[in-house]
Design a protein with these regions (language model features):
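SAM-dependent transferase fold signal centered on methyltransferase-like domains
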Residues: 1-243
């Protein structure tokens, strides 16, 4: 069976030859063919092969994520990073998730680490609505405050112990805002799509430049490649302490 299972939906790149057998499986209620992804909102072309509707609830690491696979991206390749982030925060932390989406990182952190507060910012209204639903679905309303808007235009002033920047499309443009939001000694988890030849050099330089502009210094705590994003390009993440 080729494809990836998201909730009760089997997502495929082409119609399976063994479709009759697949739809007999009790955990598959729908089969969806996704085509090219395009636009700033990263929405794919969709063809319904079996079943009705493209909304599902996906379970991972004791968390529930409700979303529409036709309108929202779900990357299996980021599973390890979601698991890692779920255990890093301390219980007294205030966290800002600048690119919250449907709660990819916010929900695991809230469910497993139970920090004091997570401000989860999302600019896409569709993703924001699912974020709000997922906060309720996982019963973390007392921890997570969803915010609809531009993460670069918020009023936070050095309130965050930890900042999530889990987006790879021009994330560096928001580093100045992250510096404004982050407390001295706070940590930024900075994601970027980076060519192999400058795999960690470029993201480190970008964070360092943003810090130096406001008289701050950085300490790189961890750096890793999450996955290959495209030929010669990696999805990288850096954990950086900003003093």
């Amino acid at each position: 069976m080729k494809g990836k299972l998201i909730g009760d939906i089997l997502v495929v790149k082409k119609e399976p030859e063994d479709l009759d057998e697949i739809i007999k499986l009790p955990y598959i209620n729908k089969v969806v063919k996704l085509g090219k992804i395009h636009g700033q909102k990263r929405e794919p072309d969709v063809e319904m092969i079996y079943g009705e509707g493209t909304e599902t609830v996906h379970k991972e690491n004791y968390c529930k994520f409700k979303f529409d696979v036709a309108r929202i991206m779900w990357s299996k390749g980021n599973t390890g990073e979601r698991l890692r982030m779920s255990t890093l925060p301390e219980s007294d932390e205030t966290i800002i998730d600048m690119f919250a989406g449907i709660g990819y990182f916010t929900i695991p952190m809230a469910v497993h680490s139970k920090p004091k507060k997570i401000y989860a910012i999302e600019i896409n209204p569709v993703s924001y609505n699912y974020l709000c639903e997922n906060v309720k679905l996982n019963k973390v309303e007392d921890i997570v405050e969803p915010i609809l808007g531009d993460c670069g235009l918020q009023d936070f002033d050095h309130v965050a112990d930890r900042i999530m920047m889990g987006y790879i499309g021009g994330t560096h443009h928001y580093l100045d805002s992250a510096m404004k939001y982050l407390k001295p000694g706070g940590i930024i988890h900075y994601h970027e799509s980076t060519p192999e030849v400058i795999l960690f050099e470029r993201p480190v330089q970008r964070v360092q430049m943003a810090a130096e502009k406001v008289g701050r210094s950085i300490e790189v705590l961890n750096k890793r490649s999450i996955k290959k994003y495209s030929p010669g390009v990696h999805h990288t993440v850096l954990d950086i302490k900003v003093n």
